[in-house]
Amino acid sequence: MFEMYIESGMNKLRCGYTTGSCATGAAKAATMLLFDLINSEEELNEIEIDTPKGIKVEMPIDHVVVGKNFVQCTILKFSGDDKDITMGLEIQATVEKISKEEAEELSKKLISNESKIIVLDGGIGVGRVTKDGLFVAKGEPAINPVPRQMIIKEIESILPKDKYVKVIISVPQGTEIGKKTFNPRLGIEGGISILGTSGIVYPMSEDALKASIKLEIKQKSLKNKNLILTFGNLGENYCKSLGYIEEEIIICSNFIGFALECCVSCKVKSILIVGHIGKMSKIAYGCFNTHSRVCGVRLEVLALELTLLGYDVSLVNKVLNEKTCEGAVKLLGSGYENLYKNIGKKILNSMKTYVYDELKIDAVMYYGASNPILLWSSCLE
């Protein structure tokens, strides 16, 4: 069993392996069994693969199905201490013997290696790409370039001479799980993606989230140079209630600065940021990672702006004693339009400074979770 750890502060966190590694291991194991490259099925309890990181990964084989001309192996996705949505998913590879003629014909429409002895496709639960701008061409299975290379390389290393195989990667629960990932937003339908650039899942996968944000901006900016940035599902729903459509909305989580940088690099012309005052107030004073562990100022922004407007210190203290911005807004009640306007203008100035005025920027700020209520919008100025 694969055991690798990284240090995170005072904690020791266990790494896992990607869906790409699972697919590779399952495909290699199935090929070995199909061509009797081991003594018996019982002997193959684990499979070892090389990863692009140069780290060897051993994975247990969950179960095997042997047919007349095919073998199917299943490996369970293991995410280590990064408990993502794919943890425990069955990743299956079915490897089938085919003729040279079949391989040549299939290679015209499926993924294949240079010598056309291996053809590769996605089965049930592996998404299909329906839009341009991704790492995989429109119409192809969502098996990313590195996992493709890994699968082909491992099979090439063991496939007997003058033998040809068709490899199908499937994820039985992938159709449902795929709906809960970024895939529908990216135009990947019908399942999950087979991913991984290193073969290893590292806990605290901030990089993976950023990569998804970058990819979504790249893909959506191909057809739309005016995008909407928001922080999460609540913001997305509010955007839709305002009439915006999914094709122009980007969920950037806490990484607003990173998302702005991606918009600039993708030649986006304008962005509208839509967010709850709790997140937006942080941007007003230059915080472009809005996670509470990175920046906790929210009530302090409201308190400072109230002070600058000349409000009594007793009111300022009441705001500071609230637990959330939501509570502070409700405490204040109506009649504080200038407060939200001043914060809003500072949000715009802060963002424009961040991108060196390379983007036209507007902002919408609201409060309320179940029923968002507009506090300020530069679009109405």
UniProtKB/Swiss-Prot annotation:
Sorted UniProt keywords: Cobalamin biosynthesis, Methyltransferase, S-adenosyl-L-methionine, Transferase
GO molecular function: cobalt-precorrin-5B C1-methyltransferase activity
The keyword Methyltransferase belongs to this UniProt entry's keyword annotation: yes
Catalytically driven reaction(s): Co-precorrin-5B + S-adenosyl-L-methionine = Co-precorrin-6A + S-adenosyl-L-homocysteine
Enzyme Commission code(s) on record: 2.1.1.195
Superkingdom, taxonomy of origin: Bacteria
Pathway in which the depicted protein is active: Cofactor biosynthesis; adenosylcobalamin biosynthesis; cob(II)yrinate a,c-diamide from sirohydrochlorin (anaerobic route): step 6/10
Signal peptide limits: none
Class of the enzyme per the UniProt entry, highest EC level: transferase
GO biological process annotation, one example: methylation
HAMAP family assigned: CbiD (MF_00787)
Similarity annotation: Belongs to the CbiD family.
Protein name listed in UniProt: Cobalt-precorrin-5B C(1)-methyltransferase
Organism: Clostridium botulinum (strain Eklund 17B / Type B)
